[in-house]
């Protein structure tokens, strides 16, 4: 079995029953599938793509570093750990400050996973803005200013000692500007779409609706899996049966 397919199956099993923190109507597995897709799109090797599927497993499920190492080896474990917060007992600010400094030290393969993770999250955030018609950060424990600081700082850490013109870094920067600029760039709206404000808004909405649909399509493109569950919800065990 290819390493990426094995990682995908493991992620499906590990995140079974979980939903997105920001959107309770969506299964958690949408996000790692999206991250892996982004990494593949930008041409990264199979181990990096596999780590994209697995990047939230240690942080958000019962599975441990040993589980990743025993199933996927040292390289993929290292890639996953590059996008895993080490000490959840620290405050949000402390954890993010540590992450910002640690990302600077990573090589490009490790940075790519962090970048793809942030791209996926920001696309989801912008989709929510489009749905509700406004930029609302109230769903976050830390609001606009802290989120803006974190994403902009992570971007600076990603391009540290790297070429800022690497396509995925450029795309991340565009998404950060889109998400955290409260005043719209009026050139496109007022000059290109002069007198056609409704058409501009519709086109923008359609674009991000398409992004959302493509994320969902990647989920529905998965082959059928059978998941066997034994035990109680707290102590139960899930087994993936192809």
Name each model feature, range by range.
Residues 229:
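Hydrophobic anchor at the beta1->P-loop junction of P-loop NTPases
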Residues 1-194:
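Active-site helical microenvironments for divalent-metal-assisted chemistry
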Residues 176, 186, 207-210, 220:
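Generic low-complexity, intrinsically disordered sequence content enriched
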Residues 192-217:
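N-terminal pre-Walker A segment at the start of P-loop NTPase domains
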Residues 217-224:
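Phosphate-binding P-loop
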Residues 234:
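Walker A (P-loop) phosphate-binding loop of P-loop NTPases
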Residues 238:
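Walker A/P-loop
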């Amino acid at each position: 079995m290819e390493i990426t397919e094995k990682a995908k199956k493991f992620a499906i099993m590990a995140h079974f029953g979980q939903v997105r923190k920001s959107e309770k109507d969506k299964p958690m597995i949408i996000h790692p599938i999206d991250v892996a897709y982004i990494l593949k799109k930008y041409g990264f090797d199979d181990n990096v793509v596999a780590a994209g599927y697995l990047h939230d497993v240690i942080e958000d499920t019962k599975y441990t570093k040993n589980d990743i190492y025993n199933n996927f080896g040292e390289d993929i474990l290292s890639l996953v750990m590059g996008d895993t917060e080490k000490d959840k007992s620290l405050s949000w600010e402390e954890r993010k400050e540590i992450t910002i400094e640690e990302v600077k030290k990573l090589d490009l393969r490790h940075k790519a996973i962090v970048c793809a993770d942030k791209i996926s999250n920001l696309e989801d955030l912008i989709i929510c803005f489009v749905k509700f018609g406004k930029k609302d950060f109230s769903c976050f424990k830390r609001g606009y200013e802290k989120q803006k600081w974190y994403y902009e700082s992570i971007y600076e850490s990603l391009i540290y000692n790297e070429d800022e013109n690497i396509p995925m870094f450029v795309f991340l920067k565009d998404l950060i500007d889109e998400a955290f600029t409260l005043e719209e760039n009026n050139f496109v709206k007022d000059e290109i779409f002069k007198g056609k404000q409704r058409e501009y808004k519709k086109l923008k909405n359609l674009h991000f609706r398409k992004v959302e649909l493509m994320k969902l399509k990647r989920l529905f493109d998965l082959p059928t899996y059978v998941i066997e569950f034994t035990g109680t919800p707290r102590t139960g065990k899930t087994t993936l049966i192809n």
